[in-house]
């Protein structure tokens, strides 16, 4: 037997979450500001995100790391270690789409800070 329940999945999500968290911790510089993308996080307007980026820049934060949970969500250890938790609404989004969404929001925030007309209120 596989030691799991009838469908062989007992403990799999938690194990996957632990492995994903370990890989993210290993890849994240200690000095980085860690932002977890999580449906239970705070929702930031684009200008609010720009203000946060400016504050972190002015405070000398050397790097930002955006963590995206896997298919089963983020582990509790990621939630505990995150400096901020950001939500793109309460919906669940595909991992690859979230990568594009956060990239666009970072770009948008930078254009807001530089006075570029890309963002319109």
Segments and roles (model prediction):
Residues 69:
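Rossmann-fold NAD(P)-binding glycine/threonine-rich loop
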Residues 41, 72-74:
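Conserved nucleotide-binding/hydrolysis micro-motifs of P-loop NTPases
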Residues 2-65:
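S-adenosyl-L-methionine/SAH cofactor-binding core of RNA-modifying enzymes
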Residues 76-120:
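Structured adenosyl-cofactor binding patch, chiefly the S-adenosyl-L-methionine
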